[in-house]
Amino acid sequence: MSAAFDPSAYDAQLQAKVTRLRELLAPFGAPQPAVFDSPREHYRLRAEFRLWREDGQRHYAMFAPGEKHKAILIDDFPIASERINALMPRLKAAWQASDELSNRLFQVEFLTTLAGDAMVTMCYHRPLDDAWEVAARQLAEELGVSLIGRSKGKRLVIGRDYAVEKLDVAGRVFSYRQPEGAFTQPNGAVNQKMLSWAYDAIGERDDDLLELYCGNGNFTLPLATRVRQVLATEISKTSVNAALSNLSENAVDNVRLVRLSAEELTQALNEVRPFRRLEGIDLKSYAFGTVFVDPPRAGMDPDTCELTRRFERILYISCNPETLAQNISQLQDTHRIERCALFDQFPYTHHMESGVLLVRR
């Protein structure tokens, strides 16, 4: 469910989310949530459009859920970053003027960053040849972007296959590679607030951190500066490679990253079976005081919930407050909510990001 884009209605919509989060966390004695609002427009750093033919031309288009044959033509997109809005008409003019760029083009994706970087992906229902690459190189130079062409089984990269983001957390600027096609937080301004909240919530520690679902290291980098050591897990190869690059780029050297699922990590910690991917890592050498989780919308499964129970402190970022409440219900006999927050990553929708710090009773 989404509401119409209406900045004048933003404050009321945000208050409704705050009320909903309070209702969900009230049974657990949660304190009042800290509330982190979003810019009212130009907050979304990525956008994806299908192309729709009308009057002999291809136009940016989106579709309402369940109405894939009824296109909504898009000329501008006020929730997207100013950079995306500046690129949209220039890219459209380029494909309208070039058969090489327009032939069988069906989708366009934009990824921008607060640091000013931009990457455009153009998707085709045909093989890409040398003539396309010549035209695309010229276009990338004119637009000042990295440009990626995709067709079935093939990807042509002009420039880089990632965008660079820079985020300030407690006065330190962290640099992030954001690979094409990988998950990134869409609302950069709110992401920066979220990182700062997590940094403050974990505090200065002299013990170790276990992080599940670390992605490209979005939280890993700042949180690693607050603890002695970090063991981080992630199963996506693309995200693992990006996280390793980000750790190196930022000279963060107290993190070990392993490709294990939460289930496999539980088996390893319980010494059920050894894992070759843990070769050279002595799990018994870690003194874990905190576990950090940022699970998908389904939340943590019951076994992962039980894994987190063994830790003194659970720092939990959630993109679905309903499953967050379910997980807290499973943990409430051993842990209580010490602090909580709402991050308005997705204005004009019912979606909300939230965070809680749970501590052992």
Curated annotation (Swiss-Prot):
Q: Which InterPro entries match?
A: MeTrfase_TrmA_AS, MeTrfase_TrmA_CS, SAM-dependent_MTases_sf, TrmA_MeTrfase, U5_MeTrfase_fam
NCBIfam families named in the record? trmA_only
Which species does the entry assign this protein to?
Pseudomonas putida (strain W619)
| Keyword field | Methyltransferase, S-adenosyl-L-methionine, Transferase, tRNA processing
Q: What is its EC number?
A: 2.1.1.-, 2.1.1.35
PROSITE patterns to which the protein is assigned, alphabetical: SAM_MT_RNA_M5U, TRMA_1, TRMA_2
Residue sites binding S-adenosyl-L-methionine per the record: Q185, Y213, N218, E234, D294
Q: Which CDD domains match?
A: AdoMet_MTases
Task of the protein: Dual-specificity methyltransferase that catalyzes the formation of 5-methyluridine at position 54 (m5U54) in all tRNAs, and that of position 341 (m5U341) in tmRNA (transfer-mRNA).
The record, for Gene3D superfamilies, names: 2.40.50.1070, Vaccinia Virus protein VP39
Q: Name one GO cellular component term.
A: cytosol
Enzyme type, top EC level: transferase
Catalyzes what?
A: uridine(54) in tRNA + S-adenosyl-L-methionine = 5-methyluridine(54) in tRNA + S-adenosyl-L-homocysteine + H(+); uridine(341) in tmRNA + S-adenosyl-L-methionine = 5-methyluridine(341) in tmRNA + S-adenosyl-L-homocysteine + H(+)
Its recorded name reads: tRNA/tmRNA (uracil-C(5))-methyltransferase
Give any GO molecular function from the UniProt entry: tRNA binding
Protein family: Belongs to the class I-like SAM-binding methyltransferase superfamily. RNA M5U methyltransferase family. TrmA subfamily.
